[in-house]
């Protein structure tokens, strides 16, 4: 459900800001844009695998998350990358038309919240006491790796360097 909200926000932004959508790259060199695109594709595929693993194998009444946390931790981590992601594109288009330091701080905060949440989910899946014999567990972990690279490295660290140039 949350992933659909992100897709709808992106579609709305791209369809209503046609003249600005090419500027979303900022000054990211064309030589690395293909890496972004490839990583985005792997991230989207990975999202389905790690989400499927959680839905199928992690009981909602689970206390297997480090022996003390329940499923609320998973919900918070998902919310940490879904909810801010919904706001990123509209905030970025606003930054293009009416830039302010506060808006830039907001965009950077959104990107770091998403990045840290995805890395937190990867850590949770690796170190928690879940059923790990399923191929879906390993597919989920493998899928989370490009997701973390995309959100924490490419989006939160690399893109901001080039966006405001």
Predicted feature locations:
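First transmembrane helix
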Residues: 1-3, 51, 112, 120-127
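Alpha-helical transmembrane segments of multi-pass membrane proteins
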Residues: 2-18, 153-155
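Membrane-interface interhelical loops and short amphipathic "cap" helices
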Residues: 15-33, 92-105, 157-165
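Interfacial helix-start motif at the membrane-water boundary
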Residues: 29-48
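Transmembrane alpha-helical segments in integral membrane proteins
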Residues: 45-61
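Membrane-proximal helix-loop-helix units in multi-pass membrane proteins
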Residues: 59-118
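Terminal transmembrane helical module of multi-pass membrane proteins
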Residues: 116-165
């Amino acid at each position: 459900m949350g992933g659909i909200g992100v897709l709808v926000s992106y579609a709305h932004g791209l369809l209503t800001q046609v003249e600005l959508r090419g500027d979303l790259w900022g000054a990211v060199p064309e030589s690395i844009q293909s890496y972004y695109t490839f990583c985005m594709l792997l991230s989207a595929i990975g999202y389905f695998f790690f989400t499927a693993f959680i839905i199928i194998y992690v009981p909602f009444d689970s206390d297997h998350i480090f022996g003390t946390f329940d499923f609320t931790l998973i919900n918070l981590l998902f919310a940490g990358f879904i909810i801010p992601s919904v706001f990123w594109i509209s905030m970025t288009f606003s930054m293009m038309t009416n830039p302010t330091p506060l808006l830039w701080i907001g965009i950077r905060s959104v990107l770091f919240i998403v990045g840290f949440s995805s890395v937190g989910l990867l850590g949770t899946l690796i170190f928690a006491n879940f059923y790990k014999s399923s191929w879906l567990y390993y597919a989920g972990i493998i899928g989370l790796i490009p997701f973390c690279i995309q959100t924490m490295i490419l989006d939160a660290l690399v893109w901001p360097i080039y966006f405001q140039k």
